[in-house]
C-alpha cells in the first residue's frame, strides 16, 4: 500500500500547483484583456442603460494600482456602485476573512506546537492536527481556545446582526426609500372570504389606508398574454432570420454577377416560406409568418377584452393595501404583528417593501392549506434529494482517500503503482472539482421547487434557495465527504478491530481536513481567477455571441444588459467555507491559513465584479446577509459537537463538560439573537422615520425599536379611534410618534452622529477596511450608530424620488401588444414586412442597419425599451 502521508503530501502539492497555475493564467489573461475588452471587464462604466449614479469611473490601468484602488474604496462607494445586496456580501467575505486572519494569529502559536510536539507520530499535515496529540491533558488547550475563538465568532455575529438592523432602518428612512411606492404598500395574503368580499372590514382594520387593490383570478388572461408573447418572439425571430438570409443571398448574387430577383417578397431570395407545426411532431403544419401575424391580431382583441373586464373576474385571497406614507404603513404592519385585533381573522402573511416586479403573481391565489401542502411536497422532495445525493458525493469522498482502500479492495491495486504526481491529481484535484460540479446542478431545481411551494416574491425564492442549498452543501460537501473520508482512511483498521471503530473514526476524523485543504485551494485560487477572467462571458462576447445573436434585440441585450448575481446561490458556497473553517479551526487549525488566503482573494474578485461588471437584481435590501450570519451557528454546533465527541472517546471528562457548557451557551445565544433581531428585519421604528424626515429632535431607539414597535402595535386600536375622530393624518402622526417617547428618553444625548447632508464625495470617505476596524474598536458608536449609517449612504439616497403611479396589478393587465424589431435592410424587405403586417402587428426597423459585410447592427434601443424605474 502507498504511504498515506506521501499521498497526502502529493495531493496537496498537486492541488497547489494545479490551482496556482490556473490562477496565474486566469489573472494574467484578465490583466491583459481588461484594457481593451471593456464591454466584458468594465461594462458598467460604458453602457448607456446604466443609471448615472450607478456608473463608476474607469478603474486604473496599472495592474498593481488596480488592487489598491479596489481595496481602498469606502463603504459609501461600495453601497452606491455594488448596491446594498452587493455591499453586504462584500462585508460578509471581509468579516470572515478577517476572522480567519485573527484565528491564525491566536490559534497557530498555541495549537500547532501542542499538536505537533511529543505526539503519536503522524506524518504530513496530520502532525499538526488533533489526531497527533498523545497527552490527553493537552486537550484543555483545545477547549479554552475553542471558547475564545468561538466566543469571538458569536460576538461578531451579534455585532453584524445589530449593524444590519440599524442599516436597514436607516436605509428605509432615507429620502429615496421613504418615498418609494413599495415603502407604503402592504400585501396581505390568505384572507377569508368574509373579509375579502366585505371591504368595510378592511376599511375598519386599516382606516389610514388610501387604496385597496384585490387580486383577481387572471389565469385565462395570463395564458393568452403568454401565448401572444411567445408568438411575438417567434414572429420576430422568423422575420430576422428570413431577412438575414435574403441579404446574404443578395450579396452572393452581386458578388458573382448573377441576375437579381425581379420582384420583392419573402420568397424572393429564399426558396420556401418558413413553416412550423402547432404541436410537436403531430401538429398541423402552418405558414409561420401568416399564422403569427393573424393569431397575434386575434389575441390582441381577446386580451384587450379580458383586460377591460377586470371587475368580472373572481377575487382571490390576497389584497394590496396602499397607505399615504411609510409611517402609516409601518404603524399598520406593527399592529399586524402585535395587536390582538388581527388574530381573530386568521390572515396569512403581511409583506411590506415589495415592488410589483418582485411578486410571483401566480402564487397569490393559493389558499393557506394549498400553500402549506405544496411547500411540504417541495421540502419532502429536497429532503429525499439530500439523502440520495449522498451516494455520488460519498464516492468523491472515498476517492480523496483511495490510498487507504487499496489494501482490502483488490481491484484498486493498480492505483498503488501509479506515479505519485498522478496519484496526487486523483486524490487531490479530481474530488474537489467533481464535488463542485455536482453541487452546481442543485440550485436551479431548488428555485423551481421554491416557486412551486408557494413563494410570494423572487426574494423569497432566493431565500428558499439559500436555506436549502446551504443544507445541501453542509450535508453533502461537509458531513458526507468528511465521514466517508474518515471512514475510508480507517477502513482497514476497522476491519481488523471492529470493536474499536468509534475510536478509530474519531482519531481519523481530523485527517479528512486534507481534502478540504484541496477544496480551499480550488475555491481560493481557481474560482476567484475564473470570476475575474469571466471566460464564458468573453467567449459569448467574442465568438458564440456572433453566432447566436442573430437579431437586433439579442445583440442589444448582449451589450446593454448586465448579468446579476443570484444571492440564494452565491451565499451558500461561501457560507460552507465558513462552516468548514470553523469546524476544523480547533481540530486541524492549519486549514484556517488556507481559508484566510481564499477569503482575501474572493473578496477582491467580488469587489471588482460588483463594482464594474455585475448589475443589480431584485432589491433584497441585504436580507441574505443576516440569514448567512445565522447559518454560521451550524458551523459552531458541528465544531462543538465534534470536539465533545472526540473528548468523550478520549475519556477526558473535564474537557467534555467544559465544551458541553459552551455548547449550551452557543444555543442560548442563537435563540436570543433570533428573538432579538428577526422581528426587526422588516419593521421600521416610527421614530427612525420621523427622526430623518419629519421630527429631527426624535432619536433612534437604543433597543433598535423593539419596545416601540410592540407599543405601537398594541396601541393600534387607540390610534384607530383617534384617527376616526380626526379630519386628517396630522393627529395620527402625533399619536404614533408619542408611542416612542419612552424610547426617546433612553437615548444617550451625547451620541455622536453625522448629518446626511454633509456628504460631499464618496472618494473622501475612509476605506471600507479602515472603517470596519475603527467601528470594531469603537463599540459605543456601533451601539448608537444610526446617524453614522445615514452618513454612509450615498448622497442620492437623500433625495426623495419622484416616480410615476405604480400599480400593484398583474403584469398581464398591463401587457401591451408585442413590438417586433427587425433590421432595416438595403433590399426593402423590412419595409415590405411592415406593410404586410400593418393593422395587425406593430413592426419596427428603427435604430438598425446592415454593415458593408452584410451583418446586422443596432444603432439604438429596441422600440419597446423603457428605462427601469424604482418602485
From Swiss-Prot:
Bias (Polar residues) ranges: 727-740
MF-aspect GO terms: calcium-activated cation channel activity
Membrane topology: Multi-pass membrane protein
Presence of the UniProt keyword Iron in the record: no
Keyword tags: Calcium, Golgi apparatus, Ion channel, Ion transport, Membrane, Phosphoprotein, Transmembrane, Transmembrane helix, Transport
Main location: Golgi
Any one GO CC term of the record: plasma membrane
Domain of life: Eukaryota
Coiled coil: none
InterPro entries to which the protein is assigned, alphabetical: Csc1-like, CSC1/OSCA1-like_7TM, CSC1/OSCA1-like_cyt, Csc1/OSCA1-like_N, PHM7_ext
Transmembrane segments: 11-31, 92-112, 139-159, 380-400, 422-442, 475-495, 520-540, 562-582, 586-606, 629-649, 653-673
Region (Disordered): 727-746
Record's subcellular location: Golgi apparatus membrane
List of residues that carry Phosphoserine: 725-727, 729, 737, 761
PANTHER family named among the record's database cross-references: PHOSPHATE METABOLISM PROTEIN 7, PROBABLE MEMBRANE PROTEIN DUF221-RELATED
Protein task: Acts as an osmosensitive calcium-permeable cation channel.
Family statement: Belongs to the CSC1 (TC 1.A.17) family.
The protein's name: Uncharacterized membrane protein C24H6.13
Organism: Schizosaccharomyces pombe (strain 972 / ATCC 24843) (Fission yeast)
Amino acid at each position: 500500500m502507498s504511504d498515506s502521508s506521501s499521498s497526502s503530501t502529493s495531493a496537496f502539492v498537486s492541488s497547489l500547483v494545479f490551482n496556482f497555475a490556473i490562477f496565474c493564467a486566469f489573472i494574467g489573461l484578465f490583466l491583459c484583456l481588461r484594457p481593451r475588452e471593456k464591454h466584458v471587464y468594465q461594462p458598467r462604466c460604458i453602457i448607456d442603460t446604466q443609471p448615472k449614479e450607478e456608473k463608476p469611473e474607469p478603474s486604473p490601468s496599472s495592474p498593481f494600482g488596480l488592487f489598491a484602488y479596489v481595496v481602498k474604496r469606502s463603504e459609501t462607494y461600495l453601497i452606491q456602485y455594488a448596491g446594498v445586496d452587493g455591499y453586504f456580501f462584500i462585508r460578509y467575505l471581509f468579516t470572515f476573512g478577517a476572522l480567519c486572519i485573527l484565528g491564525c494569529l491566536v490559534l497557530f502559536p498555541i495549537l500547532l506546537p501542542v499538536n505537533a510536539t511529543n505526539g503519536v507520530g503522524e506524518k504530513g499535515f496530520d502532525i499538526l492536527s488533533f489526531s497527533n496529540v498523545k497527552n490527553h491533558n493537552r486537550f484543555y488547550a483545545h477547549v479554552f481556545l475553542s471558547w475564545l475563538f468561538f466566543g469571538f465568532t458569536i460576538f461578531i455575529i451579534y455585532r453584524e446582526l445589530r449593524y444590519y438592523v440599524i442599516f436597514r432602518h436607516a436605509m428605509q428612512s432615507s429620502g429615496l426609500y421613504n418615498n418609494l411606492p413599495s415603502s407604503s404598500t402592504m400585501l396581505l395574503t390568505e384572507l377569508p372570504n368574509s373579509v375579502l368580499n366585505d371591504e368595510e372590514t378592511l376599511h375598519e382594520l386599516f382606516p389610514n389606508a388610501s387604496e385597496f387593490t384585490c387580486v383577481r383570478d387572471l389565469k385565462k388572461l395570463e395564458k393568452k398574454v403568454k401565448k401572444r408573447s411567445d408568438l411575438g418572439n417567434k414572429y420576430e425571430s422568423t422575420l430576422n432570420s428570413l431577412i438575414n438570409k435574403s441579404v446574404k443571398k443578395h450579396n452572393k448574387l452581386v458578388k458573382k454577377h448573377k441576375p437579381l430577383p425581379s420582384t420583392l417578397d419573402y420568397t424572393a431570395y429564399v426558396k420556401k416560406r418558413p413553416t412550423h407545426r402547432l404541436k410537436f411532431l403531430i401538429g398541423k403544419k402552418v405558414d409561420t409568418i401568416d399564422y403569427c401575424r393573424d393569431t397575434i391580431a386575434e389575441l390582441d382583441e381577446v386580451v384587450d377584452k379580458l383586460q377591460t373586464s377586470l371587475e368580472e373576474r373572481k377575487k382571490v385571497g390576497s389584497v394590496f393595501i396602499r397607505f399615504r406614507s411609510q409611517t402609516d404603513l409601518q404603524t399598520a404592519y406593527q399592529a399586524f404583528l402585535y395587536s390582538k385585533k388581527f388574530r381573530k381573522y386568521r390572515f396569512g402573511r403581511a409583506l411590506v417593501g415589495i415592488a410589483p416586479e418582485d411578486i410571483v403573481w401566480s402564487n397569490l391565489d393559493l389558499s393557506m392549506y394549498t400553500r402549506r401542502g405544496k411547500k411540504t411536497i417541495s421540502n419532502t422532495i429536497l429532503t429525499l434529494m439530500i439523502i440520495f445525493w449522498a451516494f455520488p458525493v460519498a464516492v468523491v469522498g472515498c476517492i480523496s482517500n483511495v490510498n487507504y482502500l487499496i489494501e482490502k479492495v483488490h481491484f484498486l491495486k493498480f492505483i498503488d503503482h501509479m506515479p505519485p504526481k498522478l496519484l496526487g491529481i486523483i486524490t487531490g484535484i479530481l474530488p474537489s472539482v467533481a464535488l463542485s460540479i455536482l453541487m452546481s446542478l442543485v440550485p436551479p431545481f431548488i428555485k423551481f421547487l421554491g416557486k412551486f411551494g408557494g413563494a410570494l416574491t423572487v426574494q423569497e425564492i432566493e431565500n428558499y434557495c439559500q436555506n436549502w442549498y446551504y443544507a445541501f452543501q453542509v450535508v453533502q460537501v461537509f458531513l458526507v465527504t468528511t465521514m466517508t473520508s474518515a471512514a475510508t482512511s480507517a477502513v482497514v483498521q476497522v476491519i481488523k478491530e471492529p470493536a474499536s471503530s468509534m475510536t478509530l473514526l474519531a482519531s481519523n476524523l481530523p485527517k479528512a481536513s486534507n481534502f478540504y485543504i484541496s477544496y480551499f485551494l480550488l475555491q481560493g485560487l481557481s474560482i476567484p481567477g475564473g470570476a475575474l477572467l469571466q471566460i464564458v462571458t468573453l467567449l459569448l462576447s467574442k465568438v458564440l455571441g456572433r453566432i447566436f445573436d442573430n437579431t437586433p434585440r439579442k445583440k442589444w441585450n448582449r451589450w446593454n444588459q448586465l448579468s446579476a448575481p443570484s444571492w440564494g446561490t452565491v451565499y451558500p458556497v461561501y457560507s460552507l467555507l465558513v462552516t468548514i473553517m470553523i469546524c476544523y479551526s480547533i481540530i486541524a487549525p492549519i486549514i484556517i491559513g488556507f481559508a484566510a488566503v481564499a477569503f482575501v482573494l474572493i473578496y477582491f474578485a467580488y469587489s471588482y465584479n460588483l463594482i464594474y461588471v455585475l448589475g443589480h437584481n431584485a432589491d433584497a435590501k441585504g436580507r441574505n446577509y443576516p440569514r448567512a450570519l445565522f447559518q454560521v451557528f451550524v458551523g459552531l454546533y458541528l465544531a462543538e459537537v465534534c470536539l465533545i465527541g472526540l473528548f468523550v472517546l478520549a475519556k477526558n471528562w473535564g474537557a467534555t463538560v467544559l465544551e458541553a457548557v459552551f455548547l449550551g451557551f452557543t444555543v442560548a445565544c442563537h435563540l436570543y439573537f433570533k428573538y432579538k433581531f428577526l422581528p426587526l428585519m422588516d419593521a421600521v421604528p416610527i421614530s427612525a422615520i420621523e427622526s430623518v424626515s419629519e421630527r429631527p429632535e426624535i432619536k433612534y431607539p437604543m433597543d433598535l425599536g423593539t419596545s416601540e414597535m410592540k407599543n405601537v402595535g398594541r396601541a393600534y386600536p387607540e390610534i384607530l379611534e383617534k384617527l376616526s375622530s380626526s379630519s386628517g393624518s396630522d393627529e395620527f402622526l402625533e399619536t404614533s410618534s408619542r408611542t416612542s417617547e419612552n424610547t426617546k428618553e433612553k437615548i444617550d444625548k451625547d451620541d455622536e452622529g453625522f448629518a446626511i447632508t454633509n456628504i460631499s464625495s464618496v472618494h473622501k470617505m475612509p476605506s471600507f477596511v479602515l472603517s470596519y476596524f475603527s467601528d470594531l474598536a469603537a463599540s459605543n458608536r456601533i451601539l448608537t450608530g444610526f446617524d453614522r449609517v445615514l452618513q454612509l449612504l450615498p448622497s442620492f439616497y437623500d433625495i426623495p424620488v419622484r416616480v410615476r403611479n405604480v400599480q400593484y396589478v398583474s403584469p398581464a393587465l398591463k401587457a401591451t401588444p408585442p413590438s417586433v424589431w427587425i433590421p432595416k435592410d438595403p433590399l426593402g424587405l423590412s419595409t415590405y414586412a411592415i406593410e404586410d403586417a400593418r393593422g395587425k402587428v406593430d413592426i419596427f426597423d428603427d435604430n438598425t442597419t446592415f454593415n458593408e459585410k452584410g451583418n446586422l447592427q443596432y444603432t439604438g434601443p429596441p422600440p419597446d425599451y423603457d428605462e427601469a424605474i424604482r418602485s
